[in-house]
C-alpha cells in the first residue's frame, strides 16, 4: 500500500487529552501520514503545546470557535491525500489502525467511509448508534441505564449484527471517521449548518447516497467519551438545535 493519508483534529481547550491522541497516532502509524491540528481559539495552551512538542504536525489557528465541522472544513483545500481521517482530540490508538483502515478501503473500492470499533480506555465497548437517528433512538440513547442495552438501543446500535466481520451502517460516529479524500471534498466537507453534533450523521447520510458506509469491528480505537451535552446546558441546547436542523434537512430533502 502506497497511499497518502491525512488526518485532522479540531481542538478547543483540549490540552488534557490532545497529547495522548497525537503521540499514539504518530507512534503507531507506519503509513505516509500527515496530521493537522485546527485550533478553535484555545486559551489553555493547546496549540503552543503541539507546536513545541510535535513539529511534524501542522497547526492551524481558526481565529475563534468556529465549531467542529467548520474547523475540519478549513483544511480541505490543503489535502492532497488519498484517504482522510477525522479524529476527536480524546481518541487514542494502540496499533496501526490508520494503515489497517486504508488497506480496507484499498480492498473495497465500493466503500467510501469506514468506521472502526470504539471502546473506552478500559476496553469496554461504547454503544454508539449505527442507524439513522430518529426520536425513539435518541430517547433510548439519552436515557439508557448502566445495565444491558434494551431493545430500542440494541436496534439503534445494531448490536445483533455479526461483529466478526465488517457490515454496512447508516450512521458513523464522528469521533473517528476514515473517508476517501476525494469523496470528502466532493461533498464539500461537513455541512456548515451544524456548529457541533449531528454533522457526523449528516455526512454519513450524504456518503450513503453515492457510496457505502461500513463499520469495521476488526479495527479498534479508544475514546474518552464524556457525553458533555448531558451535563452542560449550553451544549445540550446546541445538541437540540443541531438535531432539529438534521431532521428538517432530511425530512424535506428529495
Model-derived features: positions:
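A short, conserved alpha-helix in the catalytic core of glycosyltransferases
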Residues: 162-164, 168-189, 193-220
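A conserved acidic beta->alpha catalytic loop
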Residues: 24, 39-48, 64
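Short aromatic/hydrophobic "clamp" motif used to bind/position activated sugar donors
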Residues: 84
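Active-site-adjacent helix/loop segment of glycosyltransferases
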Residues: 202-205, 209-254
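Glycine-rich, basic loop-to-helix element that forms the pyrophosphate-binding segment
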Residues: 61-79
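Short, flexible, basic/aromatic active-site loop/helix in glycosyltransferases
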Residues: 133-169
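Conserved donor NDP-sugar-binding/catalytic core segment of glycosyltransferases
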Residues: 95-128
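Short, acidic, metal-binding catalytic loop of nucleotide-sugar glycosyltransferases
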Residues: 23-32
